Amino acid sequence: IITALGTFAGAGSLLRLLFPAGAFAVGLLLYFRYPILYIGFTWWLWFITPLVRRLIDYQSGWQDPSPVLLAPPLVTMICGLTLFRHLPTAYSRGGLPFLMCFTSVFYGFMLSLVKSSVAGGLLALLDWLPPLLFGFHLSVNWRQYLAYRQNLQRTFLWGVLVMGAYGLWQYLTTGAAAD
């Protein structure tokens, strides 16, 4: 709501930086105080951030790359705290597949630093690391499976409805039906 109001009030340029910062702050708060809500919030960010970017770009002009799109990976990477907290016991608790994946991603990142640009390596790291961290976070907290399952089902039900309605509206109003 704040993002939409800020966009229509003409503060789109300011929201380009405030949206990722605000999302990160809310993500930290939820991670520490309400871990189950953090999971839903993270998914909702992945669902609606492209729409938020479109609204901001509509008001303030298109910008590529857009800092708005950093919000979901930044909030997802908060799960790195789970990795550092459980790293000493990860191997003995069945975390070997995750540790192998993390090792592979960091190996690829180091190769990209040597063979190509730093920016390209960081972008690839930003693509590969958040899903691994999120998966590790979920696997370490398996004891909360029932609560996570309920939250994920509710999040995805509403996410499918909202994104489906938006996709249908966009298809019908942009003239794509005439193609």
List the model feature ranges, each with a label.
Residues 1-85, 106-111:
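N-terminal signal-anchor transmembrane segment
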Residues 53-55, 109-119, 162-179:
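Membrane-interfacial helix-loop-helix modules of multi-pass inner-membrane proteins that assemble, modify
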Residues 2-4, 38, 42-46, 100, ...:
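Hydrophobic alpha-helical membrane-embedded or membrane-associated segments
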Residues 56, 83-89, 114, 140-146, ...:
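Juxtamembrane transmembrane-helix termini
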Residues 27-35, 86-93, 162-176:
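Alpha-helical transmembrane segments of integral membrane proteins, especially early/N-terminal helices
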Residues 135-153:
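Cytoplasmic juxtamembrane interface segments
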Residues 63-77, 95-109, 116-140, 160:
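Aromatic-anchored transmembrane helix interface
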